[in-house]
Amino acid sequence: MGVNVCFISETGNDHVGNIILQFMRDNHIPTDHVNVFPDGKSPVSLAFLNEHSDAEYIFYKDYPKQRLDVLFPSINEDDIIVIGSYYALNPVLRDKILELMDIAKEKRAIVYYDPNFRSSHKNEAMKLAPTIIENLEYADIVRGSLEDFYYMYGIKDVEKIYKDKIKFYCPLFLCTAGAERISLRTNAIS
């Protein structure tokens, strides 16, 4: 499509990390903003779809103490910054995530937030609520699954999720439901 892409992340200096970096290079995605940490292993997440196209996950991780030690790419107006998952909530990475989102807002980039909140973190939902709200405040677009919001808020009704949890912070909301519908909510559409 001719659009320049930057990927900000981290990986270990191991076979998994090398596969990831080579895949990125093979697909013309620069690796300049991927922190390759020398101690620790590349995290691996495996997703298995059930008969309803809902994913079940297994996570393997062994992180070093120093994380996300990268320089951010140049960000310009109307660039799209995608943040999400526990990565955007992790207290260890929070300062770097906030730095990125502050730059994005200052430069008038579009922040797209996908909570991707998994069942493995549902017991932390209350503790993570202030960070989730902060991400919603930075977001120009929020996109999540019914499953995400169920684990975050215990709610499965799209309209209630939008009105009670999203709209105040971000007026543009997309909600998926596995193989079912995709719902769009805005100030003008409900």
Label each region the model flagged.
Residues I81, D114, I141-S145:
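Residue-level signal for inorganic ion chemistry
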Residues D62, Y86, N116-S120, E147, ...:
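Active-site beta-loop-alpha junctions enriched in small/polar residues
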Residues K107, H121-S190:
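Conserved phosphate/ATP/ADP-binding segment of small-molecule kinases
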